[in-house]
Amino acid sequence: AGSMLARNYFFVKNSKNFVFAGQKEYLIGDGLLSKAWEFLSFIDDHTAWSQPRLRDREMHKMSGYKKKVNGLEIEMGMKSQILGVSLKDNPDKVRGKAGELVFFEEAGSFPGLLKAWEVTMPTMRQGSKTLGMMIAFGTGGTEGSDFEAMEEIFYNPEAYDCMGYENKWDEGAVGTTCGYFIPIQRNLDGFIDDEGNSKEQVAVEYEEEMREKKKGAADAKSLDQ
């Protein structure tokens, strides 16, 4: 996700790219925005297509520069942007924020996700044309995480203008569609070969062994970790 934001920032002129989250902590620190900023810094430092910045804030970066024209400072350059927005239980904050790329970070712990998604959808269309791409991702598992909205979108993708995939993950779901699911055994650290392929069967065995160990814990919540 961070690389997708960086791609648009450097190569799609005037693009607006948003990351929405229920809490600011999901955006910065070890969050998606911080990872995107690392991409920008690396590319600026190590490539020939670095970009000057008109805005350089914790939650907002905008490429470009200022030039004096007839005594006035004019903003020039790519003018592509990456913006983070913490909704804080106020999904209406997404209103009017259309972009080439819109992420809903930690969607499994996102109060008001369904309303935020439905408010954003009309801004991404112009007649029969779709102007950008919306992606909701992240897992649930935390007690009180409000996972129901993510579950609704995941199991009814077409109703929310999402790409549907054959459901090959749930038992008894043959012939139904859902969102795209990435199981824990895919890309699990320590179980990837030299060519980058996941050693899924070995990863499953490892995960089952770890879960078996946790069954003896006094706190049942340890199984959710």
Whereabouts are the PLM-identified features?
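Phosphate/NTP-binding elements of NTP-utilizing enzymes
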Residues: 1-225
